[in-house]
Amino acid sequence: MSASDLTSVQAAAPQGDRQILVTSALPYANGQIHIGHLVEYIQTDIWVRTLRMHGHEVYYIGADDTHGTPIMLRAEKEGLTPKQLIDRVWTEHKRDFDSFGVSFDNFYSTDSDENRVLSEKIYVALQDAGFIAEREIEQAYDPVKEMFLPDRFIKGECPKCHAKDQYGDNCEVCGSTYLPTELLNPYSVVSGATPVRKTSKHYFFRLSDPRCETFLREWVSGLAQPEATNKMREWLGDAGEAKLADWDISRDAPYFGFEIPGAPGKYFYVWLDAPVGYYASFKNLCDRNGVDFDAWVRPGSTTEQYHFIGKDILYFHTLFWPAMLEFSGHRTPTNVFAHGFLTVDGAKMSKSRGTFITAQSYIDTGLNPEWLRYYFAAKLNATMEDIDLNLDDFQARVNSDLVGKYVNIASRAAGFLIKRFDGRVQDSAMNHPLVAKLREAIPQIAAHYEAREYGRALRHTMELADEVNAYVDGAKPWDLAKDPANAVALHETCSVSLESFRLLSLALKPVMPRVAEAVESFFGIAPLAWSDAAKPLSSEQPIKAYQHLMTRVDPKQIEALLAANRDSLQAEATGAAVATANAAKDAKNSAKANANAKQAVVNGADDAPISIDDFAKIDLRIAKIVACQAVEGSDKLLQLTLDVGEEKTRNVFSGIKSAYQPEQLVGKLTVMVANLAPRKMKFGLSEGMVLAASATDEKAEPGLYILEPHSGAKPGMRVK
């Protein structure tokens, strides 16, 4: 290898001069880690390892999210204190993260002294700056447990479709959303008692303050993901719309959390102290390691701060969190990276089908965690797209890529090198064109990882692995070994193969760190960094005896995994069913004592009169058309993206293409049926219906006209 070749490869690698703080969302200390959670932690860990391999100063911080009513109630149910519960769950979560190679520099807890102090400090700073408001609000109250009830702890009869045992904020049968006060025959999930209405003073973060809007409009321009930027702009609205609402940051006792300074019996809502937990975990690490915490978090700091999250919590991390930091005297995040959800075999994870797979069950079944790391990485990119774990594809891809292509290279060459050449490579082979091609590809692969385009990085790597295998197939070392006269050619072939394998291992190291560690031991080399692309194997360092690096996925392992999750969750499901049945029975008894349930039954012809109860079943909402496009392959349909006042938009296909161009509709308000059952169409899932008017005889009087409300109507408003 020439000096100029070495110089060019070294120059392509970024110098390790950045200081970077990275977090993943905090898992709630109320349950097990499952493979859906692992998507995020594996994604973050790959990125962190990529940066470390450049030599940057990187801290990967995590913690359990430990506060809130669910923690308090679960602890009570199990006969534990909340502290005992969260300590046990912390141990389980830490075990699972370690099993999957998630390399936190510190994994802590939000129930810590550091978090209490920082949460209070941020709150007081916001209060002093005029961002805290006090208001009396009315809430549901459990008279038996003497506690205010979150929406999800109230059940009753859906006011729209009259389905029983529905939550206090939405119906799982018809999809309607509503206020807890609209629920019919409500009961407390905690005690079964009928809730009463009670007022209480609450504390709000004034997100509606014009200073917040001005700051957030500027901050959002720096987000890396267009989907996140667009979502933020939807939430912010146009200048002057004042769409941001104040955020209730307090909860009443009894509550497991931190008491608000100067407000006895009032506690910080979990979503205030949870993100502060990022800083608390980091401060705990800094104090132990002599790192200047303040230098990392003060305004104007030259350090970088990144948050990896699921797209379902984008709202908290791109509105509340940066605004809290900005106006409490802290630096704001450099960027927030959101990912999509995980499906298994094309469907939502299911306990009944065994696809609600826990991290521990995966390990207990004997599956290699680096198989899952590789599979997720092959599916992940820089967008918020959902990814699917197809179990057949998982087995095929691991067996083909990792065993058939990658590991196979070392196993085909190592034996010959040890037996014939004392395990020492041929130095001249390090200049082979194939080796040079792999070496030159390393900076691009590293760049793909840093851009969070893991799928691209792995596709490039496996394309190179194909070329190496083609080289070995063409050289046929097994035939060369038969004739001593071919010793030089055999030595070169084995040396090229193993140096190529080293470079492929370097390319795969962020994804498969344990395999990379085994490869480093096999070659007798220091831990691989990106700059080591320019440091080939040497005859001065003999390789060790080859140890098998990876086995194939056995279909029986997948079957055992699904069975294990069905079996382990059966008792839980049975217990939950009994509890639900008892609660429902209590609710029915309470309902009979307090009210007569109404059930609407529609009979008769289409033009028969209907009752007001029948009409009330239809959930009509104001919707804003935030995007519109023609549907390829259809001459009738337009695809609408609708803001209906929820945290996420709705996708609706509408047969109005004959009347409107897509650009005519963007920005308009219309009326939609929000509780229509989603319909799977050829072009995708339609999540509702927009309303349009037309003549009875459309041939004689053609035309379609979407309904538009008067000015002043806002997305999410109900049409009554």
Swiss-Prot record:
It holds the Pfam family tRNA-synt_1g. The keyword rRNA-binding does not apply. GO terms for cellular component: cytosol. ATP binds at residue 351. One of its GO terms (molecular function) is tRNA binding. Zn(2+) binds at residues 158, 161, 171, 174. Residues 614-720 form the tRNA-binding domain. It catalyses: tRNA(Met) + L-methionine + ATP = L-methionyl-tRNA(Met) + AMP + diphosphate. PROSITE patterns: AA_TRNA_LIGASE_I (PS00178), TRBD (PS50886). A motif ('KMSKS' region) lies at residues 348-352. Keywords: Aminoacyl-tRNA synthetase, ATP-binding, Cytoplasm, Ligase, Metal-binding, Nucleotide-binding, Protein biosynthesis, RNA-binding, tRNA-binding, Zinc. It is found in: Cytoplasm. Homodimer. Belongs to the class-I aminoacyl-tRNA synthetase family. MetG type 1 subfamily. HAMAP family: Met_tRNA_synth_type1. Is required not only for elongation of protein synthesis but also for the initiation of all mRNA translation through initiator tRNA(fMet) aminoacylation. This is Methionine--tRNA ligase. It comes from Burkholderia lata (strain ATCC 17760 / DSM 23089 / LMG 22485 / NCIMB 9086 / R18194 / 383). The gene is metG.
